[in-house]
């Protein structure tokens, strides 16, 4: 993937906070379980999904439960970012990068016995690009599909309006999973896919349980018969659940101050690594006075990222200067773009004609990084004359309000890789609307290597 034009990268830096938290996972030591030969696992999750259909709702927690487990797409994104076949066994691309011909796997069934074929693929993508679609990738991916043809039951041809060098990658995201026409409408609560697991039970507020599907094409290599995702938002409750043996692992562990306790306990394995997640303080670009770029820059200069990282993550995070993670291809370090400079922040506010104190609302979802981090941010903003009233909301409230533009500032972790192209969508929740950026983004997509 080629690097984005420099002007593109600069415009991606216009938010108050941008950092990468270390990905921490705590697992029960496999050696300690060797004698039990467990065929089930209980995994802790920070947030409960609001739906189980990733094609209609934006929450990343949905994909964490269903993607590659229940629902699958044409391609698979591997941990190293490479793309390999999944429901498509192969594909070809024409010379101008606009037409993709996918050959589909034969003999694949949905969990209700329905056949997986080209008609299901066509239905899924037409549904994603429909006028009333709420698929979060509609603007970035599916609206760019000009035509879908199905020469036979195992061939799909997708013709794009404009070349997209990341198209095969996008086909591996959870927004592009394939649903059957007969079961798609119920996918929010009863998803039926082609993956190795099927939904057993969703005890709302507590857990989602999946069981092995014996009809899966590679069922012999699926070792776990049951997987339960248990929802534990509170950091201290995560610690207690691990110590009590109530869960077998906790991805994105929310109590960094407790890591040493687990690192010295031979019952556990602690994994620390990189992540594609970007923790940001999102600014509503459509609301005054945030529609003035000088105000947005002032917010950026008001934030001491090091103090935030130390206070929330015990130092286990890295500052970034744009909506690109170091794990993204083409990453450029822009951490110096908006350095911590309270006096410059005050000057920019004055230049923009903003009277201080400026009263704003800081809407915070449940994760500890947002709640604890929000308090730190509010204290920092106060020092430049911005009074942030904290509003703590539940996850469903956050999604319902924020994605309708009902917020001033918020704190959230964007976990999808290469999602900086969301800034080319003026209807996305942060309301960033720049024709210059959209033109650059289109040029970037058209010139990026597609293989």
Regions picked out by a protein language model, each given a short descriptive name:
Residues 44-95, 126, 192-194:
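N-terminal lobe/hinge region of extracytoplasmic solute-binding protein
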Residues 185, 215-260, 378, 387-389:
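Ligand-site clamp/hinge motif
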Residues 82, 164, 169-222, 226, ...:
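Gly/Pro-rich hinge or "lid" segments in bacterial periplasmic/extracellular proteins
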Residues 286-328, 372-373:
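Periplasmic-binding protein-like
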Residues 89-134, 151, 157, 241, ...:
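Aromatic- and charge-enriched surface segment that lines or borders ligand/interaction sites
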Residues 314, 318-351, 367-372:
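Structural transition elements
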Residues 36, 103, 137-180:
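Surface-exposed binding/hinge segments that line
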Residues 387-398, 421-451:
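Extracytoplasmic/peripheral linker and loop segments enriched in polar/acidic and small residues
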């Amino acid at each position: 993937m080629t690097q984005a034009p420099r002007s593109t990268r600069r415009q991606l830096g216009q938010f108050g906070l941008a950092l990468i938290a270390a990905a921490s996972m705590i697992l029960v030591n496999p050696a300690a379980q060797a004698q039990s030969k467990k065929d089930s696992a209980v995994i802790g999750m920070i947030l409960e999904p609001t739906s189980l259909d990733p094609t209609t709702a934006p929450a990343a927690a949905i994909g964490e439960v269903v993607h590659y487990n229940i629902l699958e797409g044409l391609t698979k994104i591997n941990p190293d970012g490479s793309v390999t076949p999944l429901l498509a066994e192969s594909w070809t691309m024409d010379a101008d990068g606009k037409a993709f011909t996918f050959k589909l796997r034969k003999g694949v069934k949905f969990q209700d016995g329905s056949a997986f074929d080209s008609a299901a693929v066509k239905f899924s993508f037409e549904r994603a690009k429909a006028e009333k679609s709420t698929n979060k990738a509609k603007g970035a991916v599916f609206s760019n599909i000009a035509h879908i043809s199905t020469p036979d039951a195992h061939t799909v041809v997708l013709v794009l309006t404009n070349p997209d060098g990341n198209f095969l990658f996008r086909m591996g995201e959870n927004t592009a999973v394939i649903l059957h026409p007969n079961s798609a409408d119920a996918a929010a609560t009863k998803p039926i896919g082609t993956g190795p697991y099927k939904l057993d039970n969703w005890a709302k507020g507590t857990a989602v349980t999946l069981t092995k599907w014996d009809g899966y094409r590679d069922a012999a290599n699926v070792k776990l018969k049951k997987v339960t995702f248990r929802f534990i938002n509170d950091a201290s409750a995560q610690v207690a659940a691990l110590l009590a043996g109530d869960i077998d692992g906790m991805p994105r562990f929310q109590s960094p101050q407790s890591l040493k306790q687990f690192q010295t306990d031979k019952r556990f394995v602690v994994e620390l690594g990189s992540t594609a997640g970007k923790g940001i303080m999102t600014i509503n670009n459509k609301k005054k006075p945030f529609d003035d770029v000088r105000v947005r820059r002032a917010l950026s200069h008001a934030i001491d990222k090091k103090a935030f990282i130390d206070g929330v993550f015990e130092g286990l995070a890295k500052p970034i200067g744009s909506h690109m993670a170091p794990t993204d291809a083409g990453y450029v370090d822009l951490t110096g773009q908006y350095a911590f400079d309270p006096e410059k922040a005050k000057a920019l506010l004055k230049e923009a004609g903003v009277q201080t104190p400026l009263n704003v609302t800081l809407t915070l979802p449940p994760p500890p990084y947002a709640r604890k981090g929000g308090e730190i941010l509010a204290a920092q903003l106060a020092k430049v004359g911005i009074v942030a009233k904290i509003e703590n909301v539940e996850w469903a409230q956050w999604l319902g309000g924020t994605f309708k533009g009902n917020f001033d500032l918020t704190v959230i972790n964007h976990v999808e890789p290469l999602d900086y192209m969301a800034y080319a969508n003026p209807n996305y929740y942060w309301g960033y609307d720049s024709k210059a950026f959209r033109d650059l983004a289109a040029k970037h997509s058209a010139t990026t290597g597609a293989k």
